[in-house]
A protein has these predicted regions:
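Active-site helical microenvironments for divalent-metal-assisted chemistry
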Residues: 1-177
């Protein structure tokens, strides 16, 4: 399950970059080279699976919001350095929505790895977020291309999301929605 979460988180990271109009100045291979570079950096930065998963999910958001001065105070230096290395990336369109930073950040840097796991699973268990990314036919084609290159498909991806949702429902206390 942990390997599936990491794989799903990394794939969502790549999809988030592509579907919100962030591109590299080079060709598609350059994009995947950069993605692999991000993966290797995160692996070297932290052996903690939960931190790596959460970092994947936040990279596109951090890159978008980094110009907000207060936001810099929420992230450790290694994440900010990694984002600075993504400087060649350019945003050509605005994202359709914003992640609720306070709640996400609290979970991401919680002292409890379980809290991070649960929050990550909650993030991954929102199929509507994933489906919104592929609503536009052009985006769907780009996403499918990315997933194909990473040897997975939409049905497999949604299956992982559903598994994460089931995991979260087992952890949640009765009465908490």
């Amino acid at each position: 399950m942990e390997n599936q979460l990491l794989h799903t988180a990394s794939t969502i990271c790549h999809i988030a970059f592509a579907s919100t109009g962030i591109t590299t100045p080079s060709d598609e291979q350059g994009f995947f080279d950069l993605s692999d570079s991000i993966h290797n950096r995160l692996r070297a930065i932290s052996p903690d699976l939960h931190v790596r998963c959460a970092s994947y999910l936040f990279l596109p958001v951090i890159h978008t919001e980094l110009k907000t001065g207060d936001l810099k105070n929420h992230f450790p230096a290694y994440i900010l350095q990694l984002v600075q290395e993504l400087a060649p990336l350019k945003r050509t369109t605005c994202p359709s929505g914003k992640i609720r930073f306070d709640k996400e950040l609290e979970a991401m840097f919680s002292a409890s790895p379980d809290a991070v796991s649960i929050r990550l699973a909650e993030y991954l268990s929102g199929p509507s977020r994933f489906l919104r990314m592929i609503k536009n036919p052009d985006r769907k084609a780009r996403v499918e291309k990315i997933l194909t290159a990473r040897k997975c498909n939409l049905s497999h991806q949604l299956s992982l999301l559903m598994q994460a949702e089931e995991t979260v429902s087992r952890f949640k206390s009765p009465g908490i929605t």
